[in-house]
Structure formats: C-alpha cells, structure tokens
C-alpha cells in the first residue's frame, strides 16, 4: 500500500491502520425456527398457506484494544467496550395462490409477512403483496406483476459503507418509521429460430414508487419529510439482452442496462443525487470443444462516467470504466 500527500492532505491508497473500537467486534447469533406449510389442490386452483415461528439470541461484544490483525490476542479477555445480549422471538404468516386459466395463462397472488432481525433494536417488519399473471406458449414467456411492501418499521444500521452521516463506532440502528414501496414489473423472454442460428431476447422492466410515510430526523436517514423518496431506489430500471447462438459453437450477446435517478438521502441536495445511467456490455464466446470455450467481453462500451453511488460515505462513485476481458473457461 502507498500514501500520497498533496496540498497538505493525504489521498490515494492507504496502508493498514489497525483495529479500532468499531471493527474489533464479534457478533454471534443462534436461532431455532419452526414452520408449518400446507398446499391445497382444487383442480386449477392451488393454495399454499404457511406459518413460521423463530426464537433467536444475539450477542454483541467489542474490545477497545488495538493489536493489529491478530484478533486472538485481543479477544481472550472480557469485552471492555461493549457486551450486550438479547433474546427475541417472532412469528410470520404467508399465503399464496395460483389459478390456471388455460394451458398458457396462470394468475398468481401472494401475501407474505417479512421480518429482518436487528442487533439491539426492534426487527424490521413489512407486509408484502404480489399480484400478477404468467404466460407461456413454448416460444416465449411473459410475466407481469404488481408488488407492494408496507414497512411498519424500516430499519438501518450505521456502518462504514452505508454512506450515512452517522458514527459507525456506535453500531446504532436507526428507524425510518413506516414506508411504502410499490410498483409494476415486466419480464419477457423469447427465442427466435433461424437457419442454424437461434436468437434469444429477454427484457426486464421495473417501475417503483418508494416513499416515507412520516417525518423524522436521524443521523442515518437525515431530515425526512413525509412523502420523501427512499434513498437508493430508482424510479425505474430496465435490462435488455439480445444475442445469438449458432450450431458452429459461436455465440454472443449485447446487454443494455438503464437505471433511473435516485438520491443517497431523503432530503436530496445537489451532492446527494445519483445520476440516471445506461450501461452497454458486449460478449462473444466460441466453443472449441465440449468442455472448453474462449471468450471476449467488453464492459461499459460507451465508457460513461455517471455517478451511480455515494457510499461508502463522503465519496461519489462512478461507473466501472470501459473494461476488456479475454479468457477461456473449462468444464470438468
């Protein structure tokens, strides 16, 4: 590793800085889960119901000693900085149903309670609903779904990579209150056959509306007003892949990914914006034998440099630069 100093400040790459109170920690969890699930067949209608109960214990210990990378030396004694223990339990239910309209078309519905345990805080909880249709005719497959997640307790933990203006040494969990995420999703894939060549095409598109339901202020979420957008959730995403597969063993594809704009915090300012951006990748592959292929991949063909992230904290991250990869793969 190297250090470089310019204009009185350090930049570029830094060497090992040793352990401190934030990263010299040990977290342990144990959980016991019980679940029941039953699927009922009513001909064209299938209904599945489920129940899950989970008991879990959590322990978080932190040491203030800085002894370099040898963790064994600093974790032999009692955790002098923090030692907390918690016991929790939670239950969730789910429901799912499919109805076959005909051999090509299926209706789908589902409701699932969700839970994410958090260290030293109430778990994150959400009610998740999906409604959609699936169509398949042998030459292609199409899915269209509406989805909704209603968070009663949106939770986040402060870490070095979270991008929030909080102190990672505290390992605090912040609540964003209630929030709603809903949208529409479309997935389609088709294969068009030619003379010795097939042409697979797939597209995926998602439109999302994600907002806070209440106003709050915290070091993690910042100043939030009811109706503000949730950070890092773009209004839309789209992926398009088109390629070819020949009988001679030559294949390739083009992938286009388009991501809408978003923000790194709810109160979006000039330096919190995440740009809408597009990425184009090309891939070409040739089978030499049944087991060996050679390939060439060109990523970010247009070499765009849009800002796509502002995490870890205090830094804007751009797209991966144009990258060329040449190699081979072998199947054992």
Residue ranges of model-derived segments:
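Residue-level signature of outer-membrane beta-barrel architecture
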Residues: 38-42, 53, 89, 97-100, ...
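Short sequence motifs at beta-strands and strand-loop junctions characteristic
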Residues: 22-31, 39, 57, 85-91, ...
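Signature of Gram-negative outer-membrane beta-barrel scaffolds
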Residues: 3-105, 116-120
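Transmembrane beta-strands of outer-membrane beta-barrel proteins
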Residues: 42, 47-49, 107-109, 131, ...
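Outer-membrane beta-barrel "beta-signal"
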Residues: 132, 318-332
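Outer-membrane beta-barrel pore domains and translocons
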Residues: 41, 50-56, 112-114, 147-149, ...
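Gram-negative outer-membrane beta-barrel transporters
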Residues: 44, 172-267, 290, 302-305, ...
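Membrane-embedded beta-barrel scaffold of Gram-negative outer-membrane proteins
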Residues: 100-103, 107-108, 123-216, 297-299
């Amino acid at each position: 590793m190297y250090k470089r100093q310019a204009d009185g400040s350090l930049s570029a790459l830094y060497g090992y800085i040793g352990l401190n109170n934030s990263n010299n920690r040990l977290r342990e969890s144990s959980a016991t889960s019980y679940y029941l699930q039953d699927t009922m067949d009513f001909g064209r209608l299938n209904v599945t119901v489920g129940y899950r109960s989970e008991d879990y214990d959590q322990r978080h210990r932190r040491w203030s000693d800085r002894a370099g990378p040898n963790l064994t030396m600093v974790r032999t004694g009692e955790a002098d900085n923090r030692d907390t223990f918690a016991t929790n339990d939670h239950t969730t239910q789910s429901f799912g149903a499919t109805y076959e309209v005909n051999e090509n078309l299926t209706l789908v519905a589902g409701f699932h309670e969700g839970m994410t345990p958090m260290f030293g805080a109430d778990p994150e909880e959400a009610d998740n609903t999906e409604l959609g249709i699936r169509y398949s005719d042998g030459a292609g497959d199409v899915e269209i779904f509406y989805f909704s997640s209603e968070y009663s307790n949106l939770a986040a933990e402060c870490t070095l990579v979270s991008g929030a203006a909080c102190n990672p040494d505290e390992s605090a969990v912040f609540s964003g209150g209630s929030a709603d995420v809903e949208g529409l999703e479309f997935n389609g894939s088709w294969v068009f056959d030619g003379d010795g060549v097939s042409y697979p095409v797939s597209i995926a598109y998602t439109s999302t509306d994600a907002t806070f339901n209440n106003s709050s202020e915290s070091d993690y979420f910042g100043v939030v007003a009811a109706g503000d957008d949730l950070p890092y959730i773009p209004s839309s995403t789209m992926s398009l892949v088109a390629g070819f597969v020949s009988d001679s063993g030559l294949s390739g594809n083009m992938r286009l990914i388009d991501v809408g704009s978003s923000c790194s915090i709810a109160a979006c300012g000039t330096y919190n914006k995440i740009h809408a951006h597009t990425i184009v990748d090309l891939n070409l592959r040739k089978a030499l034998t049944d087991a060996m292929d050679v390939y060439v991949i060109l990523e970010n063909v247009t070499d765009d440099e849009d800002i796509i992230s502002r995490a870890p904290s205090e830094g804007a991250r751009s797209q991966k630069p144009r990258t060329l990869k040449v190699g081979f793969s072998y199947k054992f």
